[in-house]
């Protein structure tokens, strides 16, 4: 069991967390201050220098004993693949793509991505707001030059209720005046 040099107390075990907890304690800090006040300035400086040099020398070999040291570690043997005899079976059956289509095997090309809107072969885009449903779609290059969007009616966008009225199914402005409570 390690012993604190300043407190004459045995620590429960030698770990960084135990030392850190002990070193931040009120009694330990008071004992450290008392120790250095008793030995005087000259001796205190030499003790501090020796402690610092021992930590520096120790830090060159291993700065933090809790960190992983790759040179000292022994590698674990790799697990055999799931399809290899003696390999670990997969924890669940192979997943499938949308609509129950199985995913392609590794290394094979998957299903092609659908084209983005506006590309050849893509489904047509819905009509713009305010345009009748039967209007032809703009050409693939975009809208014709100087295209004028329809002007919305006064009070907002098409399909919106006139100003001052609630949406359908909503109580009128000013609250619910139902007297059946």
From Swiss-Prot:
Compositionally biased intervals (Pro residues): 129-143, 150-174
Localization, UniProt: Nucleus
Zinc finger intervals, Matrin-type: 2-34
UniProt keyword terms in alphabetical order: Metal-binding, Nucleus, Ribonucleoprotein, RNA-binding, Zinc, Zinc-finger
Subcellular location, principal: nucleus
GO terms under biological process: mRNA 5'-splice site recognition; spliceosomal snRNP assembly
HAMAP family for this protein: U1_C
Subunit structure: U1 snRNP is composed of the 7 core Sm proteins B/B', D1, D2, D3, E, F and G that assemble in a heptameric protein ring on the Sm site of the small nuclear RNA to form the core snRNP, and at least 3 U1 snRNP-specific proteins U1-70K, U1-A and U1-C. U1-C interacts with U1 snRNA and the 5' splice-site region of the pre-mRNA.
Protein name per its UniProtKB record: U1 small nuclear ribonucleoprotein C
């Amino acid at each position: 069991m390690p012993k604190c040099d300043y407190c004459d107390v045995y620590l429960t075990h030698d770990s960084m967390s135990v030392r850190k907890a002990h070193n931040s304690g009120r009694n330990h800090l008071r004992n450290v201050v008392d120790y250095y006040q008793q030995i005087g300035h000259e001796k205190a400086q030499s003790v501090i220098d020796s402690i610092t040099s021992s930590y520096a020398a120790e830090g060159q070999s291993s700065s933090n004993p809790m960190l992983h040291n790759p040179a000292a570690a022994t590698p674990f043997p790799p697990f055999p693949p799931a399809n290899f005899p003696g390999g670990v079976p997969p924890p669940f059956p192979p997943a499938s793509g949308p609509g129950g289509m199985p995913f392609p095997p590794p290394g094979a090309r998957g299903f092609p991505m659908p084209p983005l809107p506006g590309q050849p072969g893509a489904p047509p885009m819905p009509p713009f707001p305010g345009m009748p449903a039967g209007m032809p779609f703009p050409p693939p290059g975009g809208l014709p030059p100087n295209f004028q969007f329809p002007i919305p009616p006064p009070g907002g966008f098409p399909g919106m209720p006139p100003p001052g009225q609630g949406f359908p199914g909503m109580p009128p402005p000013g609250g619910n005046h139902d007297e059946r409570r």
